[in-house]
């Protein structure tokens, strides 16, 4: 008679167990490859932090800023570059890894096995989000050493920040999926991804942290996925007693639940579109059910 332990090991895995195992495998593999890729680590972690240091050293004259505002100004600047780093991870590093797998013929093998496209997508996205958090955290950590100041607005602010950050990341990682499919050459995919990141960052005023650089209607900064995500994080991470007198206005702060709901909606739509893309294009299967 089999023992209880043997029975537990011999029990067949359910569909959910298999799906979770596949998700975990893709997450671990993707994160490992991110960390092994020196170029990805440089562009995603070192470059944003260095860009922040260069900016405050050469382009921000703190002698003209009231002493009590210097920490805030550095915090705003760092937050913009932190989200820039997260964007580099979600678009450039994520697309680059997927292009490598497509180019190496791995998907010819994946299509021949019962691999769940959603497990593939969510596993990669979990690794991408984790790496993006590291990139963001490094910039914020470096900024604290330079005198940047932060303050949580409310007890629930960490949860809001996490949701906003993940929704922001989800949108760009799904964009990266379609970039990888459309541009299967790693070199060109990298050039396009970095170009999109840079244009997005600067044309929207450091992802919405410097509205004066944004040429269109400032109200759009509370609607666009990259700027809305950044501004929600800023609202809950910076000690801004009056947004009307700060560099973050106009527009008004994204303080309402509607702004967070819009971000969550962006993330949900991105996941749906990404799932369909993985099924129909990457895995060449039917519609997901």
Regions of interest found by a model, annotated:
Residues 125-193, 198-200, 260, 271-272:
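Alpha-helical transmembrane segments and their short interhelical loops
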Residues 74-147:
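Hydrophobic alpha-helical transmembrane segments of multi-pass membrane transport proteins
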Residues 66-97, 164-181, 272-275:
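Hydrophobic alpha-helical transmembrane segments of membrane proteins
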Residues 54-62, 180-226:
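Transmembrane helix segments
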Residues 1-42, 50, 64-68, 82, ...:
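Haloarchaeal acidic low-complexity proteome signature biased toward cell-envelope/secretome components but also
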């Amino acid at each position: 008679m089999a023992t209880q332990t043997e029975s537990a090991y011999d029990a067949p895995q359910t569909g959910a167990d298999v799906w979770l195992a596949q998700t975990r495998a893709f997450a671990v593999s993707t994160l490992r490859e991110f960390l092994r890729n020196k170029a990805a680590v440089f562009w995603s972690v070192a470059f944003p932090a260095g860009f922040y240091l260069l900016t405050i050293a050469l382009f921000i004259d703190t002698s003209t800023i009231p002493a009590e505002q210097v920490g805030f100004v550095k915090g705003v600047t760092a937050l913009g570059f932190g989200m820039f780093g997260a964007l580099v991870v979600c678009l450039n590093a994520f697309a680059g890894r997927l292009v490598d797998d497509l180019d190496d013929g791995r998907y010819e093998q994946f299509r021949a096995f019962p691999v769940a496209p959603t497990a593939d997508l969510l596993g990669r996205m979990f690794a991408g989000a984790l790496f993006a958090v590291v990139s963001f955290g490094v910039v914020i950590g470096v900024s604290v050493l330079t005198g940047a100041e932060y303050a949580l607005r409310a007890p629930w602010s960490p949860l809001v920040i996490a949701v906003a950050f993940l929704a922001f990341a989800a949108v760009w990682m799904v964009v990266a999926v379609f970039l990888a499919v459309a541009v299967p050459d790693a070199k060109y995919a990298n050039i396009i991804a970095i170009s999109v990141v840079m244009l997005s960052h600067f044309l929207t005023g450091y992802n919405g942290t410097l509205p004066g650089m944004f040429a269109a209607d400032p109200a759009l900064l509370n609607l666009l996925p990259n700027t809305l995500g950044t501004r929600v994080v800023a609202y809950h991470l910076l000690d801004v007693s009056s947004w009307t007198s700060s560099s973050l206005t106009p527009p008004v702060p994204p303080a309402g639940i509607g702004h967070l709901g819009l971000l969550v909606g962006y993330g949900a739509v991105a996941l749906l579109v990404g799932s369909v893309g993985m099924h129909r294009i990457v895995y060449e299967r039917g519609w997901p059910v």
